[in-house]
Amino acid sequence: MSKIKIKLKSFDADLIEEVSKKFVAFAKSKDIKMSGPIPLPTKIERITILRSVHVNKDSREQFESRTHKRLIIFENLDKKMLDALKRQEISTGVQVEIKEIN
């Protein structure tokens, strides 16, 4: 019996919500005490590129990528439930990081 911290990362907000709902549904079906999904701050990375390298210096283009994060904490999770949790089908495009907290 231990606490498990699951951190989800994705560039797509809808995809990360779908995966976090799957984890919540899993916890409710197995009667596991949990907290979350807790939305963590979204990291926004902006890149500015010159459109033309010579005369038109004022002409620039901006791109951004947003990394959405969620945190889910499961309490009193035994080894059998942890294995079942790891076997959950997760959409591609979502990074899942599982850590055990003592």
Curated annotation (Swiss-Prot):
Q: InterPro entries this protein is in? A: Ribosomal_uS10 (IPR001848), Ribosomal_uS10_CS (IPR018268), Ribosomal_uS10_dom (IPR027486), Ribosomal_uS10_dom_sf (IPR036838)
- Tell me the GO molecular function terms: structural constituent of ribosome; tRNA binding
GO annotations under biological process? Answer: translation
Q: Could you name the Gene Ontology cellular component terms for this entry?
A: ribonucleoprotein complex; ribosome
The protein's UniProt keywords, in alphabetical order, are:
Ribonucleoprotein, Ribosomal protein
Q: Does the keyword Ribonucleoprotein apply?
A: yes
Would I find Ribonucleoprotein among this entry's keywords?
A: yes
In terms of SMART domains, this protein maps to: Ribosomal_S10
Q: What SUPFAM superfamilies is this protein classified in? A: Ribosomal protein S10
* Pfam families for the chain: Ribosomal_S10
| HAMAP family the UniProt entry points to | Ribosomal_uS10 (MF_00508)
Q: Which family does the record assign? A: Belongs to the universal ribosomal protein uS10 family.
What role does this protein play?
A: Involved in the binding of tRNA to the ribosomes.
Subunit structure, as described in the record: Part of the 30S ribosomal subunit.
Q: What is this protein called?
A: Small ribosomal subunit protein uS10
Q: Which organism is it from?
A: Mycoplasma mobile (strain ATCC 43663 / 163K / NCTC 11711) (Mesomycoplasma mobile)
